[in-house]
Each structure stands twice: as structure tokens, then as C-alpha cells.
Amino acid sequence: MTGSRSPIPVAELRILGEYRGLLFVDKPAGLQTEPDARTTDTLLSRLATQLREPLSRLHALSRLDTGVSGVVTLGLSPDARRMVQGWRELGRFRRRYLGLATSALNATSSTSSTSSTSIGAWSESIGRASGSLRTVGGRNPESAHTDYARVASAALARATPSTLHLLALAPLTGRTHQLRVHCTAHGLPLLGDRAYGGASRFISDSGAVTALDRIALHAAWVELPLSAPFRIESPTPAFLLDIWRAFAGDATAFEQARRLAISSAELPSPSTDATDLD
């Protein structure tokens, strides 16, 4: 959690689950999802080596920014890719992210944590800003919708006059940097997200400075609309838990953030088996 970012160790990637040509992989923060002209050491290239598969066979159907960790969905066949596309068009491919964000300290904040939950939705369109960045509105904007819950909050140290929030986020669309842009637009920049105004460090009451070398955002699970529940989960990384425990003490709120229904897409409904959506 401290110091500059070091190279991601070359270790075996964790396979979280498989289903009919879909592969679910646990991406560590700091590792790019796909190769490009500048980066060849990526999740897909490492996985191709690990599985002894040609890189061309692996297609990321959900992509995580380099500084973000968690579940990445891969399609190993055209049929698998069409299956996920069908779920998306029906709004049935569910995803849950956990994030730690800050806001300005307000008059009602206290030094103790609170589990008061607020639920809502953000629906501002997102377009291009400078370089690779995105912004609300912007150039060539596209519709974007994020359901969210502010699950718990805690005051940061006296030397850092702001409030820490545990967020549960459910994107219904998949725009570039969508969650990061929406959080910042609503005064809740994610810790470590320097590109979008997030704090790059914080200071404890003892004066210790903690530098953040990743974004405090984790893709916790994806859920497939099968006749029986099929949820693929990635454990909450120690990075997020350690920060929360330092200021709020009790990390059980993370389990609530995983399970809380925060959008109509996550309410109980008759399941449709994947065979109906091919």
C-alpha cells in the first residue's frame, strides 16, 4: 500500500470459474487487461502462456483498468461471446464493484464509523476529455448508468479532513472509466485515482503518510442469469480491507456491500437459462 508501484510478480493467475466457453479470471491491480502497442505483459498474455493457448483465442468481455482488481470475463469462442452479448442486451449480466472514496468532511461527520446506507443511481452521459480521459458530457458522449449504494462511512484522521465511504457499484452500461467518472462527478473520487481527482495518499493521526499505488476499486463479482444461481466472486483484496480497518475498525461492511440489492436488475426475478439466450 505504500511506496511506488512495483512490477506485478509473474505468478499463476487465479481462475475463478468456467461456464460454456467463458473463463473468469482474478486480475491483480497493476496489470493491464489486454496488450497494446506499448504493453505486452498483460492479463491476457500471461493467461495465454499459463493455459498454453494462442493469445488470439482469448477475448476480454469485461475489461478492468490497470489500477483496478477483480473479476475479468473472457470468451473463448464466438458462441460464448454472443451469449454474453445477449445477456447484456437484456440487462441480465450483473456486476458488482466495491470502492473506497472520499468526500469533504461535513458538519454531521464524526470520528466513528456509521453503517447508514443510501442507495441511488447516476445516469449522466460520458464522453471524451483530454487524452485518454473521460468526463461527464464531453465529446461524443454516450449514455451511462450506474446504480450505487453508500454502504458505510468513517471520518479520516484529523490531519486529513474528509470522510471515507465504502461504495457498492453496479454499472448497467460499460463505458470507459464509467465508475471512476461517475464517482468523481458526484463528489466521491476513488482513493488512489489520481487521474480523476482521487487522493494519492493520506495521513494518520500519528503523522504517518500512506501512499496509494493503486485505485481503491475492485470488481467483486459477476452473476450469470442461469436457472440456478451462478455468481463468480473475487475475494476483497487486503489493500481495501486494511484501509477500512484503519479508520472504521470493522470490515464486515464489505460483506454487506457484496450482498446488498442496489438496482432493479438485481432484484429476484424468474431466471432464464443460458440456452434460451444463445
For each feature predicted by the language model, list its residue ranges.
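Glycine- and acidic-residue-rich catalytic/RNA-contacting loop of pseudouridine synthases
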Residues: L31-S45, M83, A101-H165
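Short Gly/Pro-enriched turn/cap motifs at secondary-structure boundaries
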Residues: S62-R63, G138-N140, A211-R214
